[in-house]
From Swiss-Prot:
Keyword DNA damage (UniProt): yes
Domain of life: Bacteria
InterPro entries: DNA_recomb/repair_RecN, P-loop_NTPase, Rad50/SbcC_AAA
NCBIfam families, per the entry: recN (TIGR00634)
Record bears the keyword Iron: no
Record's function text: May be involved in recombinational repair of damaged DNA.
Keywords linked to the UniProt accession: ATP-binding, DNA damage, DNA repair, Nucleotide-binding
Species whose genome carries this gene: Aquifex aeolicus (strain VF5)
Designated name of the protein: DNA repair protein RecN
Gene encoding the protein: recN
Length: 520
């Protein structure tokens, strides 16, 4: 349960500390004194976003098996969270608060009219939230797979439409019959052809000087070797030199043969063939504004695309099977959820009827209407809460429920959800008075024996029923207003009950005392 609540620099609240207790804690005050700011401060601690002033801080003491102090503050424009004085994440704080506080502010009334809120409330009551999350997961997977199939079929259609063109692109390149490596060789041959006479002259002259002509390198080496052979006997060094010269002769001869092989011998037919291929390649390069190697790479990609096209039927069948499997899984889960909703809807109607009777709506009934709808991530049900003050002529809440009826219905719906350790209600008694107000107070008093209840109210009976009472007041520091929250003594509580009854007089004070006594 909640213990101490400390609020600092929270809008008009400068420095307030409130100590809640077990039972029914009641906060009252004149209109405009910021009664709901206590709720807003707790919402701030629970992570509510907003434009909060620098230095804002809210600290809350949770009492249970162990004492936990949670804090959120704004420093340098950023929110910081703490658990027992140590820095913590927002998610850690929210996890610690989970199941501890059920906060029902005035704005929650509006949610009663929303179909998604009504659906979520029924699912929570029916303990279906986990199954609905699973359903949502399957639904999202189904939609994703359906989109994948749609995109696949669209691309398949595009491929089929341009298949002839793609095949032509491949054919016009393959008819040339040149690979990337062969293209480089072809360019080298073309370069050779363009410089054929120059190459022939250079090779011919080299062959002549190496071996074929007079005074060739080969001939000169032979003469040198023969001359040295004549004087070989005069020095051992000559034998070594003669051997080296002989080796040189052999190398020159090998060089001659190698060079002779490089003498270009290209037929006119081969020249024409090379020029024809280069001409066709040049036309392709001009046509596609790309180099031939780039065109070859693109053709390989086109081949891959065509290969994929040939296997699309298998892929399509595979995708359709996956879609059908997910659809069957979704349908099965959706049917289970729908069945459980319809079953639990009756229990919800009965439970709400019981609570409404305790709140002085003897003949009022809630009807949970469930109709089949188009599939959504929440299933195939359209859920709407219908209400009747007299047990017939059910209509949507916004059409028939008065403010007082809505307040009590909201209270009843809040209480059928999984129990929290602390319930916080803001103006839950709006629009009710007289005997009904007394019954609501009595109901909350009984509820507070099981769990802690904090309520902000204008109701005299609720104020009288409080185990601990607080009052908000507006003060001024010069021209600057600020809000204080102070605990009321027993005497002050009676005076506050009298004020809420309409006026302070001996008669109302006496009535206030009797009302307070009625709840003891």
């Amino acid at each position: 349960m909640l213990g101490r609540l400390y609020i600092q620099n929270f809008f008009f609240i400068r420095d307030v500390e409130v100590e809640f207790e077990r039972g029914l804690n009641v906060i009252t005050g004149e209109t405009g004194t910021g009664k709901s700011m206590t709720i807003s401060a707790i919402e701030f601690l629970m992570g509510k976003q907003g434009d909060y002033p620098e230095g804002t801080a809210v600290e809350l003491e949770l009492l249970g098996e162990e004492e936990i102090i949670l804090r959120r503050e704004v420093k340098k424009g950023r929110s910081r969270y703490y658990v027992n004085g140590k820095g913590a994440s927002k998610s850690t704080v929210l996890e610690l608060l989970e199941g501890k506080i059920s906060l029902q502010g005035q704005n929650e009334f509006i949610n009663l009219f929303r179909e998604d809120f009504q659906r979520k409330l029924l699912d929570t009551f029916a303990n279906l939230n986990d199954k609905v999350k699973e359903l949502e997961k399957v639904y999202n997977s189904l939609r994703k797979k359906e989109q994948e199939l749609f995109e696949f079929l669209r691309k398949k259609e595009e491929l089929i439409q341009k298949k002839d063109y793609l095949e032509f692109r491949v054919r016009e390149v393959e008819e040339i019959g040149i690979s990337s490596e062969e293209y480089e060789e072809l360019k080298n041959k073309a370069n050779l052809i363009n410089n054929l006479e120059k190459v022939k002259k250079a090779v011919g002259e080299s062959l002549y000087k190496l071996l074929e002509g007079e005074n060739s390198v080969y001939e000169i080496l032979g003469e040198i070797r023969k001359n040295l052979a004549k004087v070989e006997s005069y020095s051992g060094k000559f034998s070594e030199l003669i051997e080296k010269i002989a080796n040189l002769e052999e190398e020159v001869y090998e060089l001659y043969n190698s060079l002779k092989e490089e003498m270009p011998e290209i037929s006119e037919e081969e020249v024409n063939e090379i020029n024809e291929k280069l001409f066709r390649i040049q036309r392709l390069e001009e046509k596609y504004k790309k180099s031939f190697p780039e065109i070859l790479k693109e053709v390989e990609e086109i081949k891959e695309e065509l290969s994929n096209l040939n296997s699309v039927d298998f892929k399509e069948e595979e995708l359709r099977e996956e879609v059908e499997k997910l659809r069957e899984e979704y349908d099965k889960l959706a049917e289970e959820v729908s069945r459980d909703r319809r079953k639990k809807a009756e229990d919800l109607e009965e439970r709400i009827e019981e609570i409404l009777k305790e709140l002085n709506l003897e003949r009022a009934k809630l009807k949970v209407e469930i109709k089949e709808s188009e599939p959504t991530k929440y299933g195939k049900d359209k859920i709407e809460f219908l209400f009747s003050s007299y047990g017939k002529d059910f209509k949507p809440l916004e059409e028939v429920a008065s403010g007082g009826e809505l307040s009590r219905l909201f209270l009843a719906l809040s209480l059928i959800l999984p129990a929290s350790e602390t319930y916080v209600f803001d103006e839950v008694d709006a629009g009710i008075s007289g005997e009904t107000s007394f019954k609501v107070a009595k109901f909350l008093k009984e509820l507070s024996k099981k769990m802690q209840v904090i309520v902000i109210t204008h109701s005299a009976p609720l104020c009288a029923a409080g185990d601990k009472n607080f009052k908000t007041e507006k003060k001024f520091l010069g021209d600057i207003p600020y809000i204080v929250v102070r605990e009321l003594s027993e005497e002050e509580k009676v005076e506050e009950v009298a004020r809420l009854m309409g006026m302070k007089s001996e008669k109302t004070l006496e009535g206030a005392k009797e009302l307070v006594e009625a709840f003891k």
